[in-house]
Amino acid sequence: IGAVNSIIEERRNNGPFNDIFNFMERVPSTSVNKKGIEALAYSGAFDSFPEINRGSFAMDAGKGETCLDLLIRYGSLYQKTAESMKNSLFGGGDEIETVRPPLPVLPELDQIEMLKKEKELVGMYISAHPLDRFRFEIEHFTTMDLPSWNDYVDKVSASRNREDFDKDQWIAGLVSSVEVKPKANGNGVFCRLSIEDFKGTTSFVLFDKDYEAVSGYLRPHEFLLMRVYVAPRYKSSGDKNNKVLEISGGRVKIRSITLLANVRESMVREMVIDMPLERIDAELRKNLKKAVSRSKGKSRLAFNVYDRENRINVEFVSRKYSVLASDELLRWLDAAGLHYRINK
């Protein structure tokens, strides 16, 4: 809080910071340490400064220093010089002359690395969410988000009705942590898996064959579509001559996993584009043909032509084109105001 207040106060009193060097010159080095500046850098606080980007701060600047180390040393030297001149016989009225060190110009961090840094240093994603590029897959191929899944697990686990169990649900998320540890008895291992989506998190504990079946997918920062269900737990009751198995709760199981990056090619069987009859003309047909030809794939393409006035619709299947539900095609359909359906 003290560091933030120090930055805000300096900006309020003396105006906006002109560049990264101006920031280092003006903000007291005793108030904002290296960790604080690093957090500001990777959360995007300096993105408006053209002379540096987030990738530059960790770059080797020579002599065992990073760019951030170089900037901190520069700021500290500048402020010590300013303080020395202020207390000198000359009264500090002269302008301080310094040579600003050159900064390496690097490509910006890729988005995944940038977002990982934001989460690591700030505790949240700021610029975007890593799952943003999979919104299509999540919208069309999941049955619930993770908070809803957690509620579903609690509800089913509390049931004593056998019919409530073993029903497949589809969830998606980013793997946030994977811990593999030996079992207490020393016989094999177990895995604690945590994933997150836009709204929350959930976790799994996997043993033996359940873990082995999906272990190849369980890597931090992997994007997964998971088919999951709640299996019943049983306990026995009654005496030794008349034992009865009763449901005593539930346990989460993973039926299968697919990489979100593969969903469009492997799971989109058909795309149906709804087309109102009154909008179909030569221009629309020409533009639609261009959009479809740029997104060739393996999914069947169909058109549902409907007449609102007479309440009639006819579906046509394209024999010439198969498509991939690419971002480019989806953006064009949205811009054209055409609704589409997947696997329906």
Model region roles, listed by residue range:
Residues 253-256, 264-344:
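C-terminal effector modules of nucleic-acid-centric enzymes and ribosome-associated factors
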Residues 18-25, 224, 267-268, 302:
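Interdomain boundary/hinge elements
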Residues 34, 50-51, 130-267, 278-286, ...:
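Single-stranded nucleic-acid-binding OB-fold domains
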Residues 41, 123, 196, 205, ...:
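Residues in well-ordered beta-strands of folded domains
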Residues 1-162, 229-231, 240-244, 248-251:
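Sliding clamp-binding short linear motifs
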